[in-house]
Amino acid sequence: MPKIIDFLFKNKKINNLIYILFFFAVYCAIIIGEGWDESFHILQGKVILNYLFSFGNIDEKILYRENYSASYWSFAYLIIKMFPTDFQLQASHLVNTFFSILTIFGLRKLAGRLFNSEVGKLAFLILFFYPVFFGHMAINSKDTILAFSHIWITYYLYEYLLNLNKEEKSKYVWRIGILASIGTGIQMVFLGSLIPVIIFFLFFFIYSKKKNLKKSF
């Protein structure tokens, strides 16, 4: 299996195919139509930004506003407003695609750290070529962003537990905090879905400590 994976990544034709797929993802983001709830999420980002920039003076009421405070949608709206009105939908899709691609690379790094580089490369290929994920990369500003937050929080949590340097640990803490705020803004129960991950790493951390103590004796 490792030889096959190395062959895939060292094969120029396969690498060219991956590059083409990246460009195809961008192409799809530009030409694809509007998702059924995209305009609502963009409006949510607009309302939140107006509220923040006006220091609470502009307080628009929209449906489910009390359930969402998505920093991601606010950030996306800020980027979208840099483009002409006729191209704001495409800009929204490109922002979503960018974070979806970061999700793929995040999974590669996480799988590489948990197992080895070959498994990381394989996870990269599987997720990239997975039709359901690829189809949602541009138009879904909820599930793909939740996946982005999940994967990178898990990766930084793993690095936090393994790193003994206090400065490095603090760096991981604020990154995890930012990602957690992104996730909870989209889905309130986001942190609850991380409980299995936290339990797994706690057991891993305790087991590693016990193993090191036994070695010292």
Predicted regions span which residues?
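Perimembrane helix-loop-helix junctions
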Residues: 1-4, 159-166, 193-217
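Transmembrane-helix signature of polytopic, membrane-embedded enzymes
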Residues: 13-16, 89-90, 107-129, 148, ...
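Transmembrane-helix motifs of polytopic, lipid-linked glycan transferases
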Residues: 15, 94-114, 152, 156
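Membrane-interface alpha helices of multi-pass inner-membrane proteins
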Residues: 25-27, 123, 172-187
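Membrane-proximal lumenal/periplasmic loop motifs of glycosylation machinery
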Residues: 30-36, 54-77
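Loop-to-helix entry region of an early transmembrane alpha helix in multi-pass inner-membrane enzymes
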Residues: 66, 70, 74, 84-102, ...
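Specific aromatic-rich, kink-prone transmembrane helix
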Residues: 106, 110, 146-165, 179
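Short helix- or helix-capping micro-motifs
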Residues: 123-128, 135, 155, 180, ...
